[in-house]
Every structure is written in structure tokens, then in C-alpha cells.
Regions:
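Active-site beta-loop-alpha junctions of metal-dependent nucleic acid enzymes
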Residues: 25, 45-67, 71
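Helix-centered, glycine/charged polyanion-binding patches within enzymatic domains
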Residues: 76-149, 157
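Short, flexible loop/turn motifs enriched in small residues
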Residues: 24-30
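A general structural motif
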Residues: 30, 68-69, 91
Length: 189
């Protein structure tokens, strides 16, 4: 399960921006995470500048892990040849929804072309998402939410190398908390 989130380095708070508009000195970094869907552990992470797209950071993120990955789920921002090529190179099945009105790609893009065919048959990605268990991708979003709630949504160091180290320390801390035990929820009613 792969996704990214923003971490604020410095700048105004959200309320001030909404009220008075943004200032030029707002700086963010993007934290890209790959999360194991069974253990909820972050298996690899990367911090990039905010102008790096998710699909540009994807190959470096995938290359970090030495685990055997059967399938990778990501949102539509990762529906690029660059991402699909990296998954094919590592023999990982792609669970990435095609963009609206996407066309077939020639060559060996079977996973994507199946998703495009499903999209055309049903008129949306809803059926494909249900049959492929794409909804488990929310596990990555949950990991980001847990990290921001427990460890904060900003970086305190100004130096980029320091920010990378700080972000990776946050990821390690989140993994330690995850290994200590995930909360068990029980439905009441």
C-alpha cells in the first residue's frame, strides 16, 4: 500500500492561510510511504521536496525494500508508465486505478489494461476496486494518520538532510508502536 503526505517545515498555520491567504515562505516536504497490509508496518519511506510528484518518487521507494512483494496498491497519481515499468521490473502486480477515460497501453501492461477494460465495461473504477480489494489501500492512509496524530505533522529541522533523518526517525517510532500492538476495536450495538 503506497501513498504520500505532506509535512510542514515552516510557514503559517492552516487557519491563517484560510483567513488571510498564503505567504511565499511556506515550505513542505512530501513523505512517501509503503505499508505492509498485513502487519501495518512501514516497509520503506522516502522524503522529497514538495515539487516531486508521487510517480517520480515511486521507483526509488520500491527499490528500497528487499521483501517479496506480490502486489502494490496506489492511487491514480501513480498511473504512469514509470510506475508500471518499475512494478513489472520487480515482478509486482499493480493495483493502480487508471485515470478517467484512460486508454490501453501497448506491450506488457496486462494489469493496467485489465483495469482499463473493467473501467470501460462498468463505466467507473468501482467494480475493479471491489474485485481487487483495492480498498485495503486505506491502510497506508491510516498509517499516515497515526503518524501525524502521534508524532506531529511538521518537521523542526531546517537542513534537508536533518529533515530526512527526522522523518525516518518518525517512521521508526511509528513501526515500534505498531509492533507493540495495534488497538483492537469491537463493535458495540
Amino acid at each position: 500500500m503506497i501513498d504520500s503526505t505532506g509535512l510542514k517545515v515552516f510557514g503559517e498555520g492552516e487557519w491563517k492561510v484560510r483567513k488571510h491567504g498564503k505567504e511565499r515562505r511556506r515550505i513542505w516536504r512530501k513523505l512517501h510511504l509503503a505499508v505492509d497490509s498485513n502487519t501495518h508496518e512501514v516497509v520503506c519511506a522516502d522524503l522529497s521536496l514538495n515539487n516531486v510528484t508521487d510517480s517520480e518518487a515511486f521507483p526509488g521507494l520500491i527499490r528500497q525494500t528487499h521483501r517479496k512483494i506480490r502486489a502494490a496498491s496506489a492511487d491514480g497519481a501513480y498511473d504512469t508508465r514509470l510506475c508500471h515499468d518499475e512494478l513489472r521490473r520487480k515482478k509486482i502486480s499493480a493495483l493502480i486505478p487508471p485515470r478517467k477515460g484512460a486508454g490501453y497501453w501497448p506491450g506488457e501492461y496486462a494489469d493496467r489494461n485489465r483495469a482499463v477494460a473493467n473501467q470501460r465495461l462498468s463505466g467507473s473504477n468501482a467494480r475493479w476496486k471491489w474485485t481487487t480489494e483495492y480498498n485495503r489501500r486505506s491502510i497506508a492512509e491510516t498509517a499516515m494518520y497515526r503518524m501525524k496524530q502521534l508524532l506531529g505533522d511538521s518537521l523542526t529541522l531546517r537542513d534537508y538532510d536533518g529533515q530526512v533523518a527526522e522523518a525516518m526517525a518518525m517512521v521508526r517510532a511509528l513501526n515500534r508502536m505498531t509492533k507493540a500492538g495495534m488497538p483492537e476495536s469491537v463493535r458495540i450495538a
